[in-house]
């Protein structure tokens, strides 16, 4: 592909297109990948469709002001985002250690973007072009639009609008608001006069003219009073709906952050239009010499079928970004994309995914949402299914069958998360059966996250019984279709509410599973999530109940070690945790014991894998099917718990 297949990135590109001055310049923390899985590509192509000229400055050197000047000054303004991931999450692990890789950068190497990229980029743009309007968007801006707890500073920060000095913030999915804002600018309206576009947030000195709004506790209040913080979050959480949501206001000293209500979800026709735009569907050729951009590998042959999620997991901030209302593409649109993929030169016959935030949420949760919006204080699937929930996989199954029939398609995988409780609510097993038969490559990844019901309740996840039922049904179906397929459970340690007792309960469950899960992570308090509010305040803002928070680093390491108790290096931490919790009964050689009395000699990794009854996964998350594992071990260690998720 040539540069002409992409949006312009240089003065040379502008010259070839006979563009003297660009209308907009997008500055992004990611490398430039022109694919609909990347927000920069979508916004750029949407604006191009509307008749605007758009240039891209990807990962500018923030220490060199000239990098921000290389495309000149835009006619209407700069659009700034940190990339597909919050820059702090991208750069640091849950234990605040620096990451050494970055899948959204050339060659997968880190160091191409600054911490707090949106703020840094905006400050540099103001330095280069003092009076040029700046509009911020994307995940980093969207989830930091109000005063928010910042895990890396361990303090409450102001709205990112204040810290970045941007003129306007677009939150959530930005196609509709950016078109409306850009057209207002084209008609001659000044950026500081644009105050009525849904899905936008701005700073205001005087709110006397505002009507029908809710004022939440101020920055000064939430930064000094945790109850006020919890109250502010609760109001934000309840008002994220395009039909019933109100304008929200939060005072920051003498000014006010004003959030207009969310934009209505995209219609199916609008979704189809967005995904039919002329994307190059790969990274810009300028990265070829550096090894390309690793992030394209997972999405190049994946299809986004819908947006939104009504699962409402507490640790996920999707409610604040994509929303709870499902927005889906038509089958025709998806089939056209699948057919197009088969004509790409590097297509090998495998479509890696057809899904969204939750693969099997292909339609709205209920008909009530269409007229009245999402319920204010009630969830669709938690703690149990709402009586109005539409449980039906028929349309999704129909779509998958059609894709499977496309010439040159060998296999269609589903790698987006499957919501197993929703799957269990469906009395028709047809989808479940075909999922196992056609759409899994030996294993299905599922996210029970924990097994203690008190922790699951705080996570917004279904109870252990639901998961156990799913596990059993999964293996029953696989047995019937004569497939030896496994489950890979994602598990989380140190979530709010999880104490050592809960972690030990999970460790005992893992012991019965018969293998050590690799998909384990510590809870990561990222901006915008309900769980992060619990972590900071020690309060569940929705119930106002106090919540136990494991903040001590030693305890957090113990909880994580318990989830991988059979790993040699974790022995001391596990033993210390069991003694601290007065669970010495789990130390010894009995069948229920987690560890022996004495620390065993450390074996080589290769040798340990061959003899380990826990049957570690290999690096590709496949079960290590070593010949040394007897059939008896396989049967007893694995078959019971393959059913999970």
Swiss-Prot record:
Q: Which cofactor does it need?
A: [4Fe-4S] cluster
Indicate the segments annotated as coiled coil, or none if absent.
Answer: none
Give UniProt keywords alphabetically: 4Fe-4S, Iron, Iron-sulfur, Metal-binding, S-adenosyl-L-methionine
Region of interest (Disordered), ranges: 598-645
Q: Kindly list the positions annotated as binding [4Fe-4S] cluster.
A: 309, 313, 316
**Listed GO MF terms:** 4 iron, 4 sulfur cluster binding; catalytic activity; iron ion binding
Check the UniProt entry and state the signal peptide residues, or none.
Answer: none
Any Pfam family from its record, for instance, is: Radical_SAM
Composition-biased stretches, type Basic residues, lie in 600-609, 632-645
- Domain (Radical SAM core) ranges: 295-566
What the entry lists under InterPro entries is as follows: Elp3/MiaA/NifB-like_rSAM (IPR006638), rSAM (IPR007197), rSAM_horseshoe (IPR023404), UPF0313 (IPR022946), UPF0313_C (IPR024560), UPF0313_N (IPR013704)
Question: Which residue intervals are annotated with compositional bias (Low complexity) in the record?
Answer: 610-624
Cofactor binding mode and count? Binds 1 [4Fe-4S] cluster. The cluster is coordinated with 3 cysteines and an exchangeable S-adenosyl-L-methionine.
Q: Which family does it belong to?
A: Belongs to the UPF0313 family.
This chain belongs to which protein, by name? Answer: UPF0313 protein CLM_0251
Origin organism is Clostridium botulinum (strain Kyoto / Type A2)
